[in-house]
Amino acid sequence: MITPTAAHAKTQATLRRACRSRAAAVFDATAGRATIAVMGPRSRELLARITPADVSNEAQRWGRAREIEVADGYAWCLRVSFVGELGYELYPTADVAVDVYDAVLAAGHDLGLRHAGYHALDSLRVEKGYRHLGHDIGPVDDP
């Protein structure tokens, strides 16, 4: 399960409570993964340059995640975007995160890839109308 940073502690506590009386366990793998967001109208084109996986709309619909080969390693690839454009979040293991990041930068150079800060992404999120737990809604809101 991938959860927003603002909801991490609450999600983990809820899952642990739910699993107490069951034959299940909760393991927090946060420290073992990095997050690299590739967002924008050419994100699919960029991603196709760094993976042999099919990243077409038919192969990976919005909201779906799967493991893909990328930059001599593997990463979870989640098709999601909070900026109002096509986008993907890559979750490589920590040991290949720098390699994946470098591959993204190299593949996006001629596509006009730019770094975007948190406030820029947040502004795009607001324009799109996506609500964010901890900013726009809280634990008592029912979106």
Predicted regions and their residues:
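Conserved, structured C-terminal
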Residues: 2-143
